[in-house]
Amino acid sequence: MKFKIFGLFLLLSILNSCGDNIPPVELSPETKILYLGNGTEPKDLDPHTVTGVPESKILMALIEGLVIRHPEGLDPLPGIAKRWDISGDGKTYIFHLRDASWSNGDTVTAGDFVYAWNRMLMPSLGSQYPDMLYDVLNAEAFNKGKISDFSLVGVKALDAKTLEVKLKNPAPYFLELLAHYTTRP
């Protein structure tokens, strides 16, 4: 019995001595590093083409959309849009953007969302989730190649801080759709 206890003590001592004596890395406050336990490496980080959970976790942490999901449910909360107005018929949404910037310091504008949605709906891109925007006027027709002029799609930057979205029919769930990472610029 004494031999077993001694052997166990010896084994634990050897395992304890295997640790590195490397001090923790000191980071300055201005260092911006995202550490994320992701399970696997992402295949891509294009919000309009990825479909995997590892990629979506990173995109949700890096890019904010017009709205975000409440952490305890699906209710939409303001994201880049500090507020929005919905017309009486439920078919027009006006998003008022807050001050936000890209990682390089450029200002996030309503035009960034127009560009992103145009790109997401382009048939040649092969986005897996273009139907997230099919409630937008003419979005489905553009994505399926029935129309080629994106200006006919119901999304328009009224100015740098105001985005207008026109729907083909009222869609009470539309804000929840906008929380999905594929609708982000």
Language-model features: where?
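Immediate post-signal peptide segment of exported/extracytoplasmic ligand-binding proteins
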Residues: V25-Y35
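Aromatic- and charge-enriched surface segment that lines or borders ligand/interaction sites
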Residues: R83-M132, E164
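Solvent-exposed, polar/charged alpha-helical surfaces in well-ordered, non-transmembrane soluble domains
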Residues: K43, M60, E64, K82, ...
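Sec-dependent signal peptide recognition
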Residues: K2-L8
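Bacterial signal peptide processing site
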Residues: G19-N21
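Surface-exposed binding/hinge segments that line
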Residues: D112-V114, L121, L125-P185
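N-terminal lobe/hinge region of extracytoplasmic solute-binding protein
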Residues: G37-G88
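C-terminal motif of bacterial Sec signal peptides marking the signal peptidase cleavage site
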Residues: I14-S17
